[in-house]
Amino acid sequence: LIPAILIMLTSLGISFVRPIFVLFVETLDINKNYLPTITGALYSIVGVFSVFSAYWWGKKVESFGLQKSIVVASILTATMYLLHAFITNPYYLIPVRTFLGFGYGALMPLLFTRISNNVNKDRRGGVLGIGSSFQVMGNLVGPLLGGYAGAAIGFSYSFFFTAAIFLLIAIAGYASLRD
């Protein structure tokens, strides 16, 4: 159950800032005519590096360990969200979003691997289905909470809160997920 909850928290954290990200980028010093293009590119950076990092993490997990990989990826993701709160120049978002993608690309595959490794083959499909349901729940709740938080407490605090979610994942991953 703990890996499924961590999957939900990861999805929640990933989707938490989606409703406010365009508004956040708009506050930076950019040409407003290019706002959709710039925001789309900044989202794409995360996606591209997630794809490449998933492969890299998959190779490294054998030597590094599953628990340690989850903790490191969560801390990396938390750190990148924390940096978002202090960014005033849109060009600084490029490396931050790159490393954010590197952390993202690890978390979901690692958490699903954790579930898969600890369940009998005859129960694996059902348990992975539960994990997927928790992922969907996080994707549904995250934008709702994120939009509310962005309006209520502001963009910077929303990034702090998201960083705290990923630190919680790191702590829970360290405390409860043993290799």
Regions found by a protein language model. Give the residues of each.
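Interfacial helix-cap and linker-helix signal at transmembrane-aqueous boundaries
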Residues: 25-26, 60-61, 148-154
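Intracellular juxtamembrane helix-capping segments at the cytosolic ends
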Residues: 106-119
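Short amphipathic helix-loop junctions that connect adjacent transmembrane helices
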Residues: 19-37
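Paired small-residue
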Residues: 80, 91-99
